[in-house]
Amino acid sequence: MESGRLIFSTAGSGAGQMLFLDCGAGGGGVGGGAMFHRGARPVLGMEEGGRGVKRPFFTTPDELLEEEYYDEQLPEKKRRLTPEQVHLLERSFEEENKLEPERKTELARKLGLQPRQVAVWFQNRRARWKTKQLERDFDRLKASFDALRADHDALLQDNHRLHSQVMSLTEKLQEKETTTEGSAGAAVDVPGLPAAADVKVAVPDAEEPALEEAAAAFEEQQEQQVKAEDRLSTGSGGSAVVDTDAQLVVGCGRQHLAAVDSSVESYFPGGDEYHDCVMGPMDHAAGGIQSEEDDGAGSDEGCSYYADDAGVLFADHGHHHHHQHADDDEEDGQQISCWWMWN
């Protein structure tokens, strides 16, 4: 810069002008040729810098289009779409929410808009659509949640009610079992002792065999007694009728019922059982026993009655046997070798 020239910028003024002070070479003061010049700012970048907007040195066509569109979107320069354009764009969005380049160009040509405007409208519309979709999904999920929560609360109430019922029933059952056990303990139950009805039935059953045996023996005795009476009542010349007590046959310590025949032979059980028993006549001198022919009548006090012809055969042996066993009969008092016989 040449000496004597000064440049002042008037940034505070809204016109953006500059002042030049030119001092002459020969001037020594203000009156010596100093001059002031006022002019506009020649640099475009400085004018834009006053607005605070920085423009890059190299720009692409897309960046220029975007800058122009956003400049149009400013509040003072925003262009509103007509209802016909909005309706056509909405219908196109319902058909397909994705915007292809060919479709974007065609829509811009039909609507008389810039392709960039159509693209931005579709982008904003998709965002609103997604927001609405999320809101609908949220409302649906919230309704489902509320329904499930109500069902859960109802199930909890039912669960508490059933639990209370179970507890009350359990308490009643325990009380019933306690009452039953108390009543059962009051009644004395001895497992080892039979019931009263069983005792009444069991006692006759225990005595029944003995009673039957006694009845059978009594019947047999009665039958043999009848047979003996029949035979005694129908005897021949030397026979006699004796009392009922004479029908008891005593031998070897055991009593037996025997039917006596009118002949010499008399009825006795097996010989093995009466091997110690003998038959023989007993007179008055020896045993104090008299026969029917001695006194003319039958005596019940004697032990044996023998005919004279049959008594001869056993006289000696019977008398000897009687004295031999007399002492033994007195000691035990049980064995008596006496027999009855009729002819």
From Swiss-Prot:
Region Leucine-zipper, annotated ranges: 132-176
GO biological process assignments: positive regulation of DNA-templated transcription
Stretches that traverse the bilayer: none
Ranges where the record places region Disordered: 218-239
Predominant location: nucleus
Keywords: DNA-binding, Homeobox, Nucleus, Transcription, Transcription regulation
One GO CC term on file: nucleus
One MF annotation (Gene Ontology) recorded for this entry: DNA-binding transcription factor activity, RNA polymerase II-specific
Subcellular location: Nucleus
Tissue specificity as recorded in UniProt: Expressed in seedlings, stems, leaf sheaths and blades and panicles.
Entry superkingdom: Eukaryota
DNA-binding region listed in the record: 74-133
PROSITE patterns: HOMEOBOX_1, HOMEOBOX_2
Family under the similarity heading: Belongs to the HD-ZIP homeobox family. Class I subfamily.
Role according to the record: Probable transcription factor.
UniProt-recorded name of the protein: Homeobox-leucine zipper protein HOX16
Organism: Oryza sativa subsp. japonica
Lineage of the species this protein comes from: Eukaryota, Viridiplantae, Streptophyta, Embryophyta, Tracheophyta
Name of the gene: HOX16
